[in-house]
């Protein structure tokens, strides 16, 4: 009986840990949040830097499939470099990253729409030629 309760507690704890780490990793996609962390000295804390290194397991497909903001993995990778962590103290750096993300999404959206239109046209041609 006690073993079953302990397993349930472990499962609940693991589920909570997974959710917290998932949420935190996704927050790393926000350059303003990174600037906030840098200005408060989190990136100077060796334990915090080690935690960021530990979080690299999110790059594995087994975990990455749960991410809504894949750019957080790129930020997590960049945070492994001390120079990048130091630059984030500067609000202009965070603003630049934010602008680059917006440009990427705009380009990605346009490219994706064109691809979807081309696929729809191709399917329509296949349907009309197949009849």
From Swiss-Prot:
Tell me yes or no: is Zinc-finger among this UniProt entry's keywords. Answer: no
Q: Which GO terms describe its molecular function?
A: transcription coregulator activity; ubiquitin protein ligase activity
> Coiled coil where?
none
Known InterPro entries for this protein? Med31_sf (IPR038089), Mediator_Med31 (IPR008831)
A Pfam family matched in the record: Med31
Superkingdom is Eukaryota
What is the annotated localization of this protein? Nucleus
Q: Keywords, A to Z?
A: Acetylation, Activator, Nucleus, Transcription, Transcription regulation
Q: Name one GO biological process term.
A: RNA polymerase II preinitiation complex assembly
Q: What is its main location?
A: nucleus
Cellular-component GO terms for this entry? core mediator complex; mediator complex; nucleoplasm; nucleus; ubiquitin ligase complex
Q: Which residues carry this modification: N-acetylalanine?
A: 2
Relate the protein's function as given in its record.
Answer: Component of the Mediator complex, a coactivator involved in the regulated transcription of nearly all RNA polymerase II-dependent genes. Mediator functions as a bridge to convey information from gene-specific regulatory proteins to the basal RNA polymerase II transcription machinery. Mediator is recruited to promoters by direct interactions with regulatory proteins and serves as a scaffold for the assembly of a functional preinitiation complex with RNA polymerase II and the general transcription factors.
Per the record, the similarity remark reads:
Belongs to the Mediator complex subunit 31 family.
Assembly: Component of the Mediator complex, which is composed of MED1, MED4, MED6, MED7, MED8, MED9, MED10, MED11, MED12, MED13, MED13L, MED14, MED15, MED16, MED17, MED18, MED19, MED20, MED21, MED22, MED23, MED24, MED25, MED26, MED27, MED29, MED30, MED31, CCNC, CDK8 and CDC2L6/CDK11. The MED12, MED13, CCNC and CDK8 subunits form a distinct module termed the CDK8 module. Mediator containing the CDK8 module is less active than Mediator lacking this module in supporting transcriptional activation.
Name of this chain's protein: Mediator of RNA polymerase II transcription subunit 31
């Amino acid at each position: 009986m006690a073993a079953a309760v302990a397993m349930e507690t472990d499962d609940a704890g693991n589920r909570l840990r997974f959710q917290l780490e998932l949420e935190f990793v996704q927050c790393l996609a926000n350059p303003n949040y990174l600037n906030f962390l840098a200005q408060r000295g989190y990136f100077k804390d060796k334990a915090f830097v080690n935690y960021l290194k530990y979080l690299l397991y999110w790059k594995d497909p087994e975990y990455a499939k749960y991410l809504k903001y894949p750019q957080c993995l790129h930020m997590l990778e960049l945070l492994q470099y001390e120079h990048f962590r130091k630059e984030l103290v500067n609000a202009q750096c965070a603003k630049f990253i934010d602008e680059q993300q917006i440009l990427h999404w705009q380009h990605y959206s346009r490219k994706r729409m064109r691809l979807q239109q081309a696929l729809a046209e191709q399917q329509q041609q296949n349907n009309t030629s197949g009849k």
